[in-house]
Amino acid sequence: MCKLRTSKSIIKRFKFKSKNKILRRMAGRSHLLQKKSSKRKQKLRKIVNLKKIDISSWKFRVPYID
């Protein structure tokens, strides 16, 4: 049987705090910022939890994380 491989792109983009808690950055803050208001850009700075539905579908991509 093949080894399970960890997706390196996911390891770089997300922080794993526990089995059911994964942190991610908000999308939409890398370019085209002139037309976005400062209030909107401030809200995009947040680090938020990944939804439970997404966590269950991503478990196989990072098999060796707690």
UniProtKB/Swiss-Prot annotation:
The UniProt family comment states: Belongs to the bacterial ribosomal protein bL35 family.
One example of the protein's molecular function in GO is: structural constituent of ribosome
Which gene does this sequence derive from?
rpl35
Name a single GO cellular component. chloroplast
Reply yes or no: does the keyword Plastid apply.
yes
Biological processes, Gene Ontology terms: translation
Q: What is this protein called?
A: Large ribosomal subunit protein bL35c
Which species expresses this protein natively? Gracilaria tenuistipitata var. liui
What keywords sit in the KW lines? Chloroplast, Plastid, Ribonucleoprotein, Ribosomal protein
- Its main subcellular localisation, reduced to a broad class, is plastid
Q: Where in the cell is it found?
A: Plastid, Chloroplast
InterPro entries, sorted:
Ribosomal_bL35 (IPR001706), Ribosomal_bL35-like (IPR021137), Ribosomal_bL35_sf (IPR037229)
